[in-house]
Amino acid sequence: MWSIMLVILADDLTGALDCAAPFAGRGLHTEIALSVEAIESALQLRPAVLSVNLGSREVGAEAAPQATAAALSSLPSDIVLFKKIDSRLKGNIAAELDATPFHLALVAPAIPDFGRNVRTGFVEGFGLDKPLNVAYALGVHAERAIIPDTLSQEDMSAALATGREVGADLLVGARGLAEALAFHMTGRQRAEPALPEPGPALFVIGSRDPITLAQVEELRRAIVPDYIAAPNGRLERIARPQHSVTLIQATPDGKDDPPLLVSDRLAASIVPVMTAPVATLLLSGGATAEAVLKAMNVSRIQLLGECLPGLGLAYVDGQCIIAKSGGFGTPGTLCEIARIAMGEKV
């Protein structure tokens, strides 16, 4: 019986959701704190799993350790700690580990189910132009890290077992490691999907990841949603959604505004006039998801699971909220959600 709370520290919101989804989908009470300040209220609900958005992905390497330290100071000591990192090693990984006390870390950023593996210390596979050196991303902390080959989910489970045997007191990884741990905690091989109810949907795309851009193009081709461009977060038109699927996409306009500013600008434009009327709100990109939910005065959510791999789902005041990391999914991922919302596919 697993009795100690698992705490996941993620550098952005979609990461916090994605890493927590395997636990929620297996029936564990899973709370998401959208900020460090929301940890206290989430702890009062006594979840089995608490996933915290540090909001440190887009800040500098000097600020990232401060967010980590603030989160750790708000948490009880008797926890299992999981440092969620991007499977493509984005963000301030070494800086965040600077503020994380540990003796030995199991570092396993692979997501084998997505074709993204670790071999001889390098992340390779889907979404990568070249292998990425895991030890380099860890900096000085690589000296206290185990970086096993993980070419399959079975490898990931074996790596988790090895980490426990040798006394690793910090788990560092992404969805693949979370899947292995969720299976270990529950004994359930697969998570149950959580699906949105049919109804009008608003897709808000802030991510510029090539994987997401391909999904947007496929959605526009196959579904033909009402499309509204938002150059640097400024909507070309703002109106109550009138179609079954409305797609808002932040696009470049020649200026190099910071991603957080673009996301805040986008959120301020659409909340509440465009978000309130829809049954399903899909947010793509961690900064975008965080900004929109903050504008909606949402600080904490209970995660129910995923509707598709990498797409965490929760309900807030009866509205379905789906968040998607930029680097997840197939070209048809957004189309699948659109068809569910349109009542065409269950």
Q: Can you annotate each of these PLM segments?
A:
Residues 115, 176-180, 187-199, 306-327:
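Short, flexible loop segments at boundaries between secondary-structure elements
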Residues 26-49, 232-243, 303-318:
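N-terminal short beta-loop-beta anion/metal-coordinating cradle
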Residues 193-271:
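Redox- and metal-dependent alpha/beta enzyme cores, enriched for Fe-S-associated oxidoreductases
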Residues 31-43, 156-162, 188, 231-240, ...:
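A short, acidic, amphipathic alpha-helical segment used as a generic capping/interface helix at domain edges
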Residues 278, 289-336:
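Conserved, well-ordered active-site substructure
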Residues 2-7, 25-33, 37, 46-49, ...:
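Cap/lid and interdomain-hinge subdomains that line or gate substrate/regulatory clefts
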Residues 252-282, 286-304:
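Catalytic cores of soluble, metal-dependent hydrolases
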Residues 12-15, 85-94, 112-113, 152-154, ...:
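Gly/Ser/Thr-rich loops at beta-strand to alpha-helix junctions
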